[in-house]
């Protein structure tokens, strides 16, 4: 069965909202340096990730989301997202069939909405962070954030 992108969009928006609520109980959201979603180059999973401004300067690899203090926070909120993405597996899980030209803009649009609602007026950088680095990360950071904030990623 192909991925149901409209259903995925709603599930992802809800998961991110729940994630932000959980994260806000742990830290003042204005104290974050970065917030976003982490994935593979196949886009076969999406997980929340965030790091604080206080820890940012001491990180040996600042752009390694797996090292961020809030990597994977509220992952349970993404169960429906995970299930919907699993629909993209074909041929006994040998092939992951995703329309990246459709999915990446969908994710970026939802993250841009999150930035408007939760981080307007802050310097929190929001993005789609892809394992191993990827043009999607660069594109998402530029599309989601004000130019001054996006410059921090370069």
Model-predicted regions and their roles:
Residues 26-57:
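N-terminal interaction modules that seed assembly of large macromolecular complexes
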Residues 47-94:
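Structured domain cores in non-transmembrane regions
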């Amino acid at each position: 069965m192909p991925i149901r992108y409209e259903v995925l969009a709603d599930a992802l928006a809800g998961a991110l909202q729940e994630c932000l609520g959980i994260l806000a109980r742990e830290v003042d959201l204005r104290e974050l340096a970065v917030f976003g979603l982490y994935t593979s180059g196949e886009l076969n999973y999406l997980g929340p990730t965030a790091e604080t401004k206080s820890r940012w300067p001491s990180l040996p690899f600042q752009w390694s989301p797996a090292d961020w203090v809030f990597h994977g926070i509220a992952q349970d909120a993404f169960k429906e997202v995970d299930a919907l993405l699993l629909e993209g597996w074909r041929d006994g899980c040998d092939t992951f069939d995703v329309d990246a030209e459709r999915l990446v803009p969908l994710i970026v649009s939802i993250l841009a909405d999150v930035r408007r609602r939760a981080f307007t007026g802050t310097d929190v950088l929001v993005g789609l962070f892809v394992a191993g680095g990827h043009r999607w990360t660069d594109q998402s950071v530029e599309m989601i954030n004000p130019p001054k904030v996006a410059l921090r990623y370069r």
